[in-house]
From Swiss-Prot:
The chain crosses the membrane at residues 45-65, 100-120, 135-155, 158-178, 252-272, 298-318. It is a multi-pass membrane protein. It is found in: Plastid, Chloroplast membrane. This is Uncharacterized membrane protein ycf78. Coiled coil: none annotated. The lineage of its organism: Eukaryota, Viridiplantae, Chlorophyta, core chlorophytes, Trebouxiophyceae. Its main location: plastid. It comes from the Eukaryota. Signal peptide: none annotated. GO terms for cellular component: chloroplast membrane. Keywords: Chloroplast, Membrane, Plastid, Transmembrane, Transmembrane helix. Belongs to the ycf78 family.
Length: 819
């Protein structure tokens, strides 16, 4: 198997080089590349033997052999290795792969003197002497290093029992801290002499245990800062073998250990110099300085210890140890429900008695994964972040809530639901246009589009009717038990509530404009708001910004890819596919649709000020006009730098002219923009859509779209009425027999017969344009059926998926080898 793999790789290498060089692939290049391949193969074999990787592979044979067998039955001639696909593919080089330096610099964040144990260590260093400080910080560093070792190497025998004690280990740390602080208040402010004091053992052990407990800090999220591409310092690194894994993580931990010691010594030296400067250059005596620092350290230690308590939720500290999960439904509509908040202004405002009976405001305080976002306009929504924090929005929201409450009290509809929720304000007139003065006074970063525009979503009643038609239509028509109808009716009413149960208050758009214009025309408020938004947007790296044209280009090609992949899904063969596609508008799962990870919440206020959608272009003419940039938190760049033009995150975009293969070098073959097949390329590790006319080097790196096709597709994507259908390649013989005008499926072939005379001349070469895996298989039928043995030739496509089974390659481009 290894010999066949070597020959296969050699043939693949020559094919790749021949595709890249084209006519420049000479005999000299062939000999040179052959020598390089032989040298690289010998080096890999020598490393494989000396690194004892063959022992590791031999021990995995009982696991690998069943995978080989099952892969043959599934016709998947490669092993699924998710770790290699998901971790190695996007792994970025960390400090030139020097894990020792990476650990050394990451230790700087672990050594910052902001935690309680660092403050106590500095207190013992400056008051009780250097030995006391060394033993205290030494126990903490060793305990921290042991904990990191257990996490990085995955020593579950130690970690799992300890982590199952949460939150008792956190409470143990709090108790130890208060005990240490209490004992320090009763100590004399004298320096301990020598390095063999028996109290040093207590200092070391207490610090070691505190390193394993929760450490409070001024910046709770500072521990996640790392110079690598990993999420935290505790992340491990991928390696090719067990020996490489051991040495890689050992060097990383060694760098953390040495860096922690050096940076801790540095901070100790800095505070000793500060002590000397305060004593020699200030009127403070030594005793006064020690008393001042002693009191300050106690206050800081107590403050940091108490700040960790509200950092954790009540369920983590109390309900979690009792067996309740996060956001347990048992606590719904109780005092422990996190989605309800008391009205802080109850009893302090001039509202009526009926309004004061509203116990809770309609404020979105639900966790990030439990909120209701992107609902239709008629569904009542919670107050967003912008409506509560920006003064211009909050004043209008507060007035609208008062008007809504007074109107509800006059209507006489007093139900139990009003005790918990208020009706939201009525939707504003989406067709209203602002004056040019209001637009000119906004932030330059804001969109110049109308401040209010309608989002192209299905209306409330269309969704309700469609839901009842497809889901509970059969139940309503049947004479089943009402108990069976009640759950479905409950789901329908809760998912699509009607807005006509109570009269809605009348909202005057002119009053809203006056209230908001009072703030947005104020230069102080306008500059502060613009500064807040600009500082937020400037937190992103400038080298990763994209312009508006690139946003539209990305969105258009993503929509085309979405339609193409939806046409290849298995449910397209269902008998009721048209109904399925009409109801779900394509794929059923949200992950198969085009979306931007850009916000948390509804952004009802921000949508009026920024452009947050890419599909706002309603005509092809707007593509040629000036477009606005989309507000989003991730700004992926096409290309990283001039020296590194390729970006693995958006390889589908058109590259620079000098990086695109000229048309003349392809031998006069015209490009066919319609993709013929799509699939995962195991060698390039990416999803490739190509038509077999591009060389392998450029396959998947360029998606060229004609201007007319782009305009037509833009109109289709906006209207959402015309679906672009694709079909798989190859087409059936029945489809090919029909002309392009008579065929219901548009198609483009790799070759075109000019006339009947040409068809007769080239009849024997009709299979030359098929791919390399096309074969003519000879078989013989039995004599019982035909009476004579007759050999026939039928075309077939053999599996060509790469991996461990090699189906062969096409002919080399080198004339010496192709002959």
């Amino acid at each position: 198997m290894s010999f066949v793999t070597t020959i296969r790789d050699y043939a693949e290498t020559l094919n790749s080089i021949s595709d890249s060089l084209g006519q420049n692939f000479t005999v000299r290049s062939f000999i040179l590349e052959t020598i390089v391949y032989i040298f690289t193969t010998c080096r890999s074999c020598l490393f494989y033997i000396l690194s004892f990787q063959w022992i590791h592979d031999f021990t995995l044979l009982p696991i690998v052999l069943p995978e080989f067998s099952s892969a043959l039955f599934r016709e998947k001639f490669f092993l699924e290795t998710p770790s290699k696909v998901f971790f190695d593919f996007l792994e970025i080089s960390d400090l030139q792969q020097n894990k020792f330096l990476l650990g050394f610099f990451n230790s700087f964040f672990l050594s910052l003197p902001f935690s309680v144990i660092h403050i106590l260590s500095l207190r013992r260093l400056l008051i009780q002497g250097r030995p006391a400080g060394v033993y205290t910080i030494g126990g903490y560093l060793i305990g921290q290093l042991v904990f990191l070792t257990c996490v990085v190497f995955g020593i579950r025998q130690v970690l799992v029992p300890w982590l199952t004690l949460e939150p008792f280990n956190y409470l143990l740390g709090i108790i130890l801290l208060f005990r240490v602080i209490y004992s320090m208040t009763r100590e004399n402010l004298i320096e301990l002499k020598g390095w063999s004091n028996p109290r040093y053992t207590n200092f070391f052990l207490v610090s070691f245990v505190l390193a394993w407990c929760e450490q409070t800090s001024c910046f709770q999220y500072l521990g996640n800062i790392t110079l690598s591409s990993n999420v935290t310092i505790l992340e491990s690194f991928s390696s090719t073998s067990s020996i490489s894994t051991f040495f890689t993580h050992t060097s990383y931990l060694l760098g953390i250990a040495i860096g922690s010691v050096l940076f801790s010594l540095f901070w100790g030296w800095v505070f000793l110099q500060v002590k000397n400067l305060c004593i020699f250059y200030t009127p403070l005596f030594t005793s006064s300085f020690l008393q001042f620092f002693n009191k300050t350290s106690f206050v800081l230690a107590l403050a940091l210890s108490l700040t960790s308590i509200p950092f954790y939720s009540f369920e983590y500290l109390v309900t979690g140890p009792l067996g309740f999960v996060s956001q347990d439904s048992v606590f719904k509509n109780t005092l422990l429900d996190q989605t309800l908040i008391k009205d802080p202004g109850k009893g302090l405002t001039g509202l009526s008695s009926l309004e004061r009976n509203f116990q809770y405001l309609d404020v979105d305080v639900s966790p990030f994964d439990r909120g209701e976002y992107l609902t239709v306009p008629e569904v009542p929504q919670n107050l967003s972040f912008e409506e509560l924090n920006y003064r211009g929005e909050f004043d209008w929201t507060l007035r609208n809530l008062k008007v809504s409450g007074i109107t509800d009290s006059r209507s006489g509809f007093f139900t139990l639901s009003k005790l918990f929720k208020k009706e939201n304000k009525k939707s504003l007139d989406s067709q209203k246009q602002l004056s040019s003065q209001e637009i000119s006074e906004r932030n330059p970063l804001l969109s110049e589009l109308p401040l209010v525009f309608r989002v192209d979503l299905a209306t409330h009643y269309d969704i309700l009717n469609r839901y009842r038609q497809f889901y509970d239509g059969n139940v309503e028509e049947s004479d089943s038990d009402p108990l069976l109808q009640r759950p479905i009716e409950t789901i329908s009413d809760s998912s699509f509530p009607s807005s006509g149960e109570a009269p809605q208050p009348r909202v005057e758009n002119t009053i809203e404009s006056k209230i908001k214009n009072k703030y947005y025309s104020n230069p102080v408020y306008k500059n502060l708001l613009a500064l807040d938004i600009d500082l937020f947007l400037k937190r992103q790296p400038k080298t990763f910004q994209v312009n508006a044209d690139q946003e539209i280009d990305l969105y258009t090609k993503r929509k085309m890819l979405e339609y193409y992949t939806n046409s290849l899904n298995s449910y397209s063969q269902l008998p009721y596919f048209e109904t399925f596609d009409s109801f779900f508008d394509g794929a059923k799962t949200f992950s198969n649709k085009v979306y931007n990870q850009q916000f948390k919440g509804t952004l009802r206020s921000v949508r009026r000020l920024f452009t947050v959608r890419n599909d706002f272009v309603s005509s092809s003419e707007k593509l040629e006009s000036k477009t606005e940039k989309v507000l989003k938190f991730d700004q992926p760049l096409y290309q990283f730098a001039e020296k590194q033009p390729f970006s693995p995150y958006h390889e589908e975009l058109a590259q620079k002219p000098e990086q695109v293969l000229p048309r003349a070098k392809i031998g006069g073959i015209s490009f066919v923009n319609t993709p013929l097949y799509a699939g995962w390329d195991e060698h390039l590790r990416k999803f490739v859509i190509t038509n077999k006319l591009l060389p392998r080097t450029f396959a998947g790196y360029k998606v060229k779209i004609e201007p007319q096709t782009l305009k037509n597709f833009t109109n289709y994507s906006v209207k959402q009425t015309t679906k672009i259908k694709f079909t798989r390649w190859p087409l059936s013989e029945e489809k090919l027999q029909l002309s392009k005008q008579d065929s219901s499926v548009p198609y483009v072939t790799l070759f075109k017969i000019l006339d009947e005379k040409t068809k007769e001349t080239f009849a024997e070469n009709k299979y030359l344009s098929f791919p390399a895996n096309f074969e003519l298989v000879e078989f013989s039928e039995s004599q019982n059926e035909k009476g004579t043995t007759e050999k026939l030739k039928k075309p077939t496509l053999v599996p060509n998926r790469g991996g461990f089974v090699w189906p062969g390659n096409s002919k080399f481009k080198l004339p010496l080898l192709s002959n």
